[in-house]
Amino acid sequence: MGDPKRQRKKYETPSHPWIKERLDRERVLKRNYALKNKKELWRHETQLKEFRRRARRLLAARGKQAEIERQQLLQRLYRLGLLPADAVLDDVLSLTVEDVLERRLQTIVYRKGLARTMKQARQLIVHGHIEVNGQVIRSPGYLVLREEEDTITYAKGSPFAKEGHPERMVIEQAKQGGEA
């Protein structure tokens, strides 16, 4: 069978543990996006660092292969919904961690009005009440692709799929109260 690949961390911890400005910023992001722990935030920060690192390397690179990789990076970020279709490589450098956090399934479920709060959105996802493109996704940190965004609904077998579910009625009332 061969040797399995070694599992590696998907995040980098901060270089210094007690920088007050960073701690304050992380606390606000953790609260606003209802993250379970800072590891979730660090994972998305590391993803963003990697995108930016690739963009800086490709800005300096010349040649046919560099142009192919530029297009692939821009296409990937477009599919993730992080950049518009007409973006250039410099736009990658202006991305923030908030842009990445806005593409999480948990955030999109809340923004679409399928949940009253971010924490409820997380719970609905973990409990299997939300499906994306007909597939139940149980990971709140799943980055939703641009074409999948319109397919986010309550799961077919979920009690929330019924129109008369009491919690759905509360969510609808909260949505209408917010619009008025």
Curated annotation (Swiss-Prot):
**One Gene Ontology term of the molecular function aspect:** rRNA binding
What is the annotated role of this protein in its UniProt record? One of the primary rRNA binding proteins, it binds directly to 16S rRNA where it nucleates assembly of the body of the 30S subunit. With S5 and S12 plays an important role in translational accuracy.
Record protein name field: Small ribosomal subunit protein uS4
Q: Which family does it belong to?
A: Belongs to the universal ribosomal protein uS4 family.
Gene Ontology biological-process entries: ribosomal small subunit biogenesis; translation
Q: Does the keyword RNA-binding apply?
A: yes
S4 RNA-binding domain span: 103-165
The record's listing under CDD domains reads: S4
